Amino acid sequence: MAEAGGGNASAPQKAPDKVVSGRVTDTAGAPLVGVNILIQGTATGVVSGSDGGFSIRMPEGRDNLIFSHIGYVSQTLPSAQTRLVRLVQDEQEIENVVVTGIFTRKKESYTGSATTITSGQLARVSNRNVFESLKNIEPSLYIMDNTLMGSDPNTLPDMQLRGITTFPSESTGVSIKGNYQNRPNQPLFILDGFETTAEKVMDMDMTRIESITILKDAAAKALYGSKAANGVIVIETKRLAGNQELVTYTGSIEVSMPDLTSYNLCNAWEKLEAERIEGVYTSANPQTQVDLTKRYNALKAQVLGGLDTYWLAKPLRTGVGHKHTLSVELGDSRKLRAMIDFSYNNVAGVMKGSERTVLSGDVNVSYRKKSFLFRNILSVSNTRSDNSPWGDFGDYARMNPYWSAVDPQTGQIARWAYDEVANPMYDATLGTLDRETYTSVTDNFYAEWQATEALKLTARLGIAVKRSDADEFYPAKHSKFATSAYESTSMQLRKGSYQLDNGKSSDISGEIYANYAKNWGRHYLYVNAGGRIAENTYSAYQHYAEGFPNSQTADITFARQYAQDKKPVGISSITREISFLGTASYSYDDRYNVDLTFRESASSLYGADNRWSSAWSAGVAWNLHNEPFLRDQDVLKQFKIRASAGLTGNQNYDTNEVLATYLYYTGATYHGQTGAYLSKMPNPALKWEQRMDYNVGADITIHRATIAFDYYNSVTENMLTDVAIPTSTGFDTVKDNLGKVRNRGIEAKLSYTLWQGKQGFFNLFGSIAYNKNIIINLSESLKAYNEKMMAQAQDKSNSTPVLIYQDGMPMNAIWAVPSLGIDPTTGQEIYVRKDGTLTYEYDAQDQVVAGISDPKYRGNFGFAAEYKGFGLSATCTFLGGGQRYNTTLVNKVENVDIHYNVDRRVLYGRWQTPGQNAMFKKLGSYTDENGKQHDEKTRATTRFVQDNNELTFSSLSLYYEFNPRLISKIRLKRLKLAFYMNNIATLSSIRIERGTTYPFARSMSFQLTGTF
């Protein structure tokens, strides 16, 4: 008998852990690498390997596995069902990741400030172009209305992210059409991991876009080092996802209607009355008075007879454009997949003959072999921009309504509207040509090797080539040549002009990165290291010719000669760069997160003494919602606090600023030899412009409400500035690094889901961005620039504020002389001197900062709803806190030439008699009763600086997506109908003409999408 407790006693044995193995793929059957597989209720897990396979030991009592991967819907499955796991990509999941263009990170562990916009969000706002959608979604990206060019489809918008960062660059003296390079405040654009241009983004087919990520603070954008100071916009196109052969067609018709609500011009009777009041038909000379009375009576009879030409409508139309996209998806989904896209987009502007036509094709091929992935995207596009032959819209706004647009005898468009006043409509009948075209070919190759479960190597090679041409032809009969300067016989032969521009550019870049990602227990480590090398070349040439007697000879080879005193000119540049990048991210228990980035870059853009520059960032984040004391509750779903600091650079500048560039003397020789001279003073010590960013923020989700908040403080230093130097050097200025500018701001977003169900949702949203810009350290070297601006302001012919820079003031400050209004006794304006005394004499030295042209805050609000396939969304945008100088009141009321049409406010509010309280003084240019000519133009005064607050109903969309079961009977997988309206209405606190060269437009479009 064995003793109690003896070694032969039978004890319960622990059951051995079972091993669960399986494979994870996407819906197309392609293996997913790096999927996190976690045993539910524990911190134990593994990561799927290069073929999507995994193997994990399951302890006793545990049976469920959680599968999660960036951009895919997480799944929890019992171990018995994990032999083959398919993860589904979800648009909502895309919002929870950050695509940087170099790697993709979970938003929960990301420390940077970034906004991700999905294709669905873009489509709910507009189907016109990317910038139209971004303008209505993200207020921190300020896409400015162009008050001159309005809704011209061929004008690229200006934009800035989190304020102005640099002084505007002075012109090189050669203005090449179609050259949109070196806009100093423009963000960097990344398309599928490669740099691209804003013009390319504007012409993109929006149906190709999967997501857009805007990188704002240093922790987010320091990846791009010396190019990231202005922010980075990362665009990802749609990846191949299906395992079937699919054909998708999207077609739309867009209707654009002119918006002339900002114009307040006189009709025929009002204009005639304004002329009478201003004394146009009054003279002290009796004989002259008789002639003036006859003229007035004749015009009055015509007006009473019904002559009232609405000139604004003459060059306009309701533009009808159309867009078509065909996408074909084919191939073996497990190894070789391909997607081919064809797109045609015709944008018809509201001015007759104004169009932008884009024809593009893309081939996306993906091949996977075991642990290797190869992807190549070839894009070819051709864009043709036709500017309206009807000329400048402002010319029509000047025409008197009592002038006839057509010859009353023949009914044809008259060459002269009145006496020697040219009819702008006539120019459109002559064969005028103003066209730009460009063709671009881009090939982006991507290779990936999943060496181990944790180590991945990636490589990119991108090649882009662009060729652009521009033709501008004006026949001899054009109104440009209907002046006394062309009356002589020799000048007659010079009538007609042609400007021909040719440009080409090429970009080649290569990148290689290694990244290591490892999960162990509660720890997660991600390390990425690599480098980039790139070269960009650009050249453009411009030719002027004249002498085209025949309007049908719209070709420069028919010119009589080169334009007088002109010769072919051009610009060229070449930029080379190399950089090395290292990033590291660490996360503990999904609670504490740290991101570190360092990039060392060298560029030929800057001086030989300062080729290299460093960019860095450090970011931390704390996920409070994952703390034990907040984990077991359902109300607070997310509460992340983050902070970052870092340094980035800007190089949106002319490449020849630091090079010793020489030009040849073409007009003389010395002993048969041609001499050369230095065209500009080089500066080998020129440094990188740098921006130091500090950012704190929070991301909070409480029940159905999502809140995001950011506060930032950015200081830009080493700003490139034209510095005055002694003329004994042979130059007036040289580029140098001087001055600092600070931008401080707050951004806040709120989204609230009122209702969410299986059949739909109803969501409210709103956001606001506030920015304050100020110059904090301005060098004395800019004193010469300010003196030049002050001299311009003192010029009696100048009526608009000039740009003056001063410490403690915003960069876009509006400078004007203080005004107390119009003296009721004399009708003259009363100015306030710097010493506080009053005067009638204008002195530009008395100017003060009267306002800021940039709005202090911008934002949007609206809703998005869907129910049983029906969707409705609306967005309003607003801005305020800034000021504008009302040029309409100056140019169309006070400084107006009364012989052309004027603003209706000329009829009232103008001082006429002593004792009258008036808003406006008497006419600036006039002839008194004694026949003496007066020209007392209104200058820049605070009287015309007005608060600028706007509310715009910017977007409305309605769509219906058919039930898949219903349309499957006709072999359709998807069918969607949509209707859009954009720029519907604008309410403004300031009455000013908008779109003075090209009018603004309201648009609506109808879209159909079908997948077979």
Model-derived regions: residue spans:
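Short, acidic, small-residue-rich periplasmic hinge/interaction motif at the N-terminus
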Residues: 2-40, 64-73, 80-123, 131
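Residues embedded in well-ordered regular secondary structure
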Residues: 125, 137-160, 167-183, 187, ...
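Outer-membrane beta-barrel transmembrane strand signature
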Residues: 190, 297-343, 410-450, 564-583, ...
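Acidic/polar loop-and-plug regions of large Gram-negative outer-membrane beta-barrel proteins
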Residues: 303, 386-442, 476, 480-499, ...
